Amino acid sequence: NNTAMQKTVFTKEQRAIHKLIVDSIGMSDIGLFDGKMGIILSLITYSRNTKHKAIEEVADFLMNQVLNNMTNISPLSFSNGLTGIGWGIEYLIQKGYMPGCGADICSEIDKKLMSCDIRRVDDLSLEHGIYGWLHYIVAHIQGANRCGKQVFDRMYIIDLISKINEY
C-alpha cells in the first residue's frame, strides 16, 4: 500500500530545529554560544513564530536543566559562562517568553560577578571579557528596573565605569 509508505518531507528549517533538539540531549555545555542556552533561544523563537507548542515544551525542559545547573559552572564568560546564561534569561523574560524577574533568577550570577575585581580584568572581548559582561549587565539592569529592583551596588557600577573609561 503506497499511502502507508508516504515519506515525510521536512524543510531545511525543520531539519535544523530537529538537529538542535537531538544535539541538546547529551550536551553538557549550558552556555550561550555553544550550549543549551543558545539552543533554547533558537527553539523559543522558532516555536513562537510557528506556534509549535511541542518545540516550546522542549525549550522549557532545556531551560529547567540550565536553571538547575547554573550554580555548577564558574566561568563568567558571555560565550560559555554565567553572563551569557544570564543575558539569555533576561532576553527571554523581556521578550515575554519566560515569566519572572531576572533580578531574582540571576542573583547568584550577580554575586559572582561582583566578587570579581573588575579593575583587574584585562580581557575586553565579547566572548570572555568585559564587553560580554556589559551585554549582561545592561540587559540585567533594564530588567531589574522593570521589576523595581537594584541588582548591582553603587561601588561595582563606579568601578565598571572607571574600567570602561580606561579604554
List the predicted regions and their residue ranges.
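Low-complexity, Ser/Thr/Pro/Gly-enriched N-terminal "stalk/linker" regions
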Residues: 4-61, 165
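Long, compositionally biased, intrinsically disordered segments
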Residues: 5-10, 72-74, 92, 120-122
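A broadly used, surface-exposed interaction patch
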Residues: 63-104
